[in-house]
Amino acid sequence: MYQSEFCDVSYNEELNIVFVKWKRFCRDKDYRNPLLYAIEVMKNCVGCHFCADTRDGFENEQADTQWVFDVFLPRALETSCKKIFFIIDADNALKEELEGLSAELSKRFEVHYCFGLDDVQKILAE
């Protein structure tokens, strides 16, 4: 388990997902360290998928978005992760921020937008 004032990262064994819960906006190491921890979880749990709850605290910061493409994405590809889930709010307030990430991520992963873990569970059960 990883915990900070910005983000909590945990492993959900039932769903076999690493769950990244953003609490408030952050950047640089405060943004990157939780994602590096998530990569380690995915490496250690075969078939583990990635799920980010973006309803609180997620914003697009150009340097961190580039870091996702340059560092997170290549490292995630070294794991057995096949699906990436973004939990969004009903009005999808972060649509623009997430579209940039999703366009690149969806080239290599199955990307889903969900309204909660129940939706994630349904997709994984298909």
Tell where the protein language model's regions lie, with residue ranges.
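Amphipathic, Lys/Arg-enriched alpha-helical "gate/interface" segment within cytosolic domains
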Residues: 1-126
